[in-house]
Swiss-Prot record:
This is Sulfotransferase 2B1. Expressed at high levels in epididymis, intestine and uterus, and low levels in brain and hypothalamus. Isoform 2 is most prominent in the brain and spinal cord, with modest expression in the lung, skin and spleen. Isoform 1 is most prominently expressed in skin and small intestine, with modest expression in muscle and prostate. GO terms for biological process: cholesterol metabolic process; sulfate assimilation. It catalyses: an alcohol + 3'-phosphoadenylyl sulfate = an alkyl sulfate + adenosine 3',5'-bisphosphate + H(+); pregnenolone + 3'-phosphoadenylyl sulfate = pregnenolone sulfate + adenosine 3',5'-bisphosphate + H(+); 3beta-hydroxyandrost-5-en-17-one + 3'-phosphoadenylyl sulfate = dehydroepiandrosterone 3-sulfate + adenosine 3',5'-bisphosphate + H(+); cholesterol + 3'-phosphoadenylyl sulfate = cholesterol sulfate + adenosine 3',5'-bisphosphate + H(+). The lineage of its organism: Eukaryota, Metazoa, Chordata, Craniata, Vertebrata. The active site is at 122 (proton acceptor). Sulfotransferase that utilizes 3'-phospho-5'-adenylyl sulfate (PAPS) as sulfonate donor to catalyze the sulfate conjugation. Preferentially sulfonates cholesterol. Catalyzes sulfation of the 3beta-hydroxyl groups of steroids, such as, pregnenolone and dehydroepiandrosterone (DHEA). Cholesterol sulfation is approximately 10-fold higher than for pregnenolone and 20-fold higher than for DHEA. Plays a role in epidermal cholesterol metabolism and in the regulation of epidermal proliferation and differentiation. Transmembrane segments: none annotated. Residues 327-338 have a biased composition (Low complexity). Substrate binds at residues 95, 100. It comes from Mus musculus. InterPro entries: P-loop_NTPase, Sulfotransferase_dom. It holds the Pfam family Sulfotransfer_1. Residues 301-338 are annotated as: Disordered. Its EC number is 2.8.2.2.
Length: 338
C-alpha cells in the first residue's frame, strides 16, 4: 500500500451512518494499485471483502462502477423481494438495506442479517469476494455510458466529503481516462466483469436499458432472481423505483447523511437520472479525446447500448468560447445521478 495511512473512524458495531461524525480529508490510498478514499475504506476493510468466507448461496450482490445506477438497482431489487410492497424502502435507509462490502462499515461484519441478503460493491472483479466464485450467490452488474458516468462523478466529487476536489472539467476528464479516480479505470472495471456473462449467476444490464424499458428490465431481473411477479406487483415495482419516486423518498435520496459526508448545500445526490447528459457538458475537443481513448480501450469488446454512431461522434454544434467550461455553470443544483 502507498499513500496516506487510512484511519478507522468508527467501530464495526456502529451502524447508524446518519449520526456518525465523519472526518475526511479528500486523500486517497492505493490497495493493489487501485485508488480508494481515506476514511471510507481501509486496507483491512478491502482485505475483509476480498477474503471473507461469509457468503451465502442466496446472497444478491449489486455491482457497479461508481455513478452507474447502483441505488436504482438497489431500489428495484428491494421492491422485488417484497413483491412490490414499498414499506421497506420507506422505512429503512438504502445503505442499510444493501450495505457495502468494502467499506469500513462492512456488510460482512453483520452476521445476523436474514436471507436473502442484498449487498453492494464497486470493487473490480480482481478484488471482489473470492468466496462468491465458488458459491451460488448472484451478481447483478449495472453498466452505464462512461461519458455520463464521468459527468455524474464530477458533480458527485464536488459534494462528497471523502473524495478529492475534481479540479477543472478538463483535469477531471483526464484523470478519469487514466483511471486516476476512486476505484480506478472504468474500462478495466467493465471489461473484467463482463467476462462473467456466460455464468448463470451473473446478470449484466445497463442504465440505458433500465431507462428505455423499466418494466421489461424489471421482468428480466425477476427472472434472474427466480422471483416472478404478478402484474400488480410488477407495476408497483416500476412505479416506486422511478426516479421521481426515489428522489422524493428520504430513505433513498441520501438527504439523511451528514454534511461532512454529502454537502447538500452544494447539490442533491439524485441529480437528473437521465442518459445523454454528457452532451450538455463535453466540448467537441473533450468528446474527441474521450472517443479516442474509448476506441483504443474497448477495441474488440462487445458493443453496448451507448455504442451508436451518434455516441461515437462529437456533440452537435461548436464548442463554447471557453476551452473547458465548468459543468456546474449550467446546473443550479449540482449533484450526482443515481
Amino acid at each position: 500500500m502507498d499513500g496516506p495511512q487510512p484511519r478507522a473512524l468508527w467501530s464495526s458495531s456502529e451502524k447508524n451512518v446518519s449520526e456518525m461524525s465523519w472526518n475526511f480529508g479528500g486523500e486517497y490510498f492505493r490497495y493493489k494499485g487501485i485508488p480508494f478514499p481515506v476514511g471510507m475504506y481501509s486496507p483491512e476493510s478491502l482485505s475483509l471483502a476480498e477474503n471473507t468466507s461469509n457468503v451465502r448461496d442466496d446472497d444478491i450482490f449489486i455491482v457497479t462502477y461508481p455513478k452507474s445506477g447502483t441505488n436504482w438497482m438497489i431500489e428495484i431489487v428491494c421492491l422485488i423481494l417484497k413483491d412490490g410492497d414499498p414499506s421497506w424502502i420507506r422505512s429503512e435507509p438504502i445503505w442499510q438495506r444493501a450495505p457495502w462490502c468494502e467499506t469500513i462499515i462492512s456488510a460482512f461484519n453483520v452476521l445476523d442479517r436474514p436471507s436473502p441478503r442484498i449487498m453492494s460493491s464497486h470493487l473490480p472483479i480482481e478484488l471482489f469476494t473470492k468466496a462468491f466464485f465458488s458459491s451460488k450467490a448472484k451478481v447483478i452488474y449495472v453498466g452505464r455510458n462512461p461519458r455520463d458516468v464521468v459527468v455524474s462523478l464530477y458533480y458527485y466529487s464536488k459534494i462528497a466529503g471523502q473524495l478529492k476536489d475534481p479540479g477543472t472539467p478538463d483535469q477531471f476528464l483526464q484523470n478519469f481516462l487514466k483511471g486516476e479516480v476512486q476505484f480506478g479505470s472504468w474500462f478495466d472495471h467493465i471489461k473484467g466483469w463482463i467476462r462473467m456473462q456466460n455464468q448463470e449467476n451473473f446478470l449484466f444490464i445497463t442504465y440505458e436499458e433500465l431507462q428505455q424499458d423499466l418494466r421489461g428490465s424489471v421482468q428480466r431481473i425477476c427472472e434472474f432472481l427466480g422471483r416472478p411477479l404478478g402484474e400488480e406487483a410488477l407495476s408497483s415495482v416500476v412505479a416506486h423505483s422511478a426516479f421521481a419516486a426515489m428522489k422524493a423518498n428520504t430513505m433513498s435520496n441520501y438527504s439523511l447523511l451528514p454534511a461532512s459526508l454529502l454537502d447538500h448545500r452544494q447539490g442533491e445526490f439524485l441529480r437528473k437520472g437521465i442518459s445523454g447528459d454528457w452532451k450538455n457538458h463535453f466540448t467537441v475537443a473533450q468528446s474527441e479525446a474521450f472517443d479516442s481513448v474509448y476506441r483504443e480501450q474497448m477495441h474488440g469488446v462487445q458493443r453496448f447500448p451507448w455504442d451508436t454512431s451518434e455516441e461515437d461522434s462529437s456533440p452537435d454544434g461548436q464548442p463554447d468560447p471557453e476551452p473547458s467550461p465548468s459543468p456546474a455553470s449550467d446546473d443550479p443544483n449540482p449533484g450526482s445521478s443515481q
